[in-house]
Amino acid sequence: LLRFALHMAIRSSFIDYREKVDEYLTSTLLFTVAFSVSMTVIVCSVSVLLNLSIPFILILLCMLQSMSSAIIEDYSYYLMMKFNYKFRTMLMIVPNLLSVVLSVLAMLYVFNTNRYLGRVIPTAIVTLFFGIFLVFLSIRRSGFVFNIEFLKHGLKISTPLILHGIA
């Protein structure tokens, strides 16, 4: 749900907002960050209220990883439509490769008893790093733009696709 399938709207922005694609992307990414942070606060608060046995830091990292994965996917579609396949391929390979290497090292040398944390924590941190990097890259290119018109356009296209994605 955090993704809102906005990557599909980014594809259509290349037709509908040809001259403002960078601003469209930044607006989309900033919405993803704002919505994800809001949902993270709600989910973490509910987990504390319900006194769940799941560690708080694990819930937080999973929520932040979800947000960052959405950012990476949105940016990946942007790169695909720009025909920038070198950077897109790097964006698909490097975070995954880096998180696997760090996960193996973490499982071998840090998390001897809870090895699953050795996979979850490095993956979440690497994904979060790349997500934050891409948001800053987008803001640097187009400025700090949050255009409600772009957001309405994007949500009109992507919202029906949420149920499709769940199915």
PLM features per residue range, with description:
Residues 29, 33, 37, 63-67, ...:
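Residue-level signature of the transmembrane alpha-helical core
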Residues 82, 86-91, 113-120, 132-167:
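Interhelical loop/hinge segments that connect adjacent transmembrane helices in multipass membrane
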Residues 44, 48-60, 82-90, 94-130:
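Membrane-interface helix-loop junctions in multi-pass transport and translocation proteins
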Residues 1-17, 66-72, 130-133, 162-167:
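Small-residue-rich midsections of specific transmembrane alpha-helices
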Residues 12-20, 68-91, 142:
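Membrane-interface junctions at transmembrane-helix termini in multi-pass inner-membrane proteins
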Residues 1-47, 87:
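Membrane-water interface segments that mark the loop-to-transmembrane alpha-helix transition
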Residues 4, 40, 70-73, 99-104, ...:
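Hydrophobic transmembrane alpha-helices of multi-pass small-molecule transporters
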Residues 13, 78, 105-109, 136:
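Membrane-interface helix caps of multi-pass small-molecule transporters
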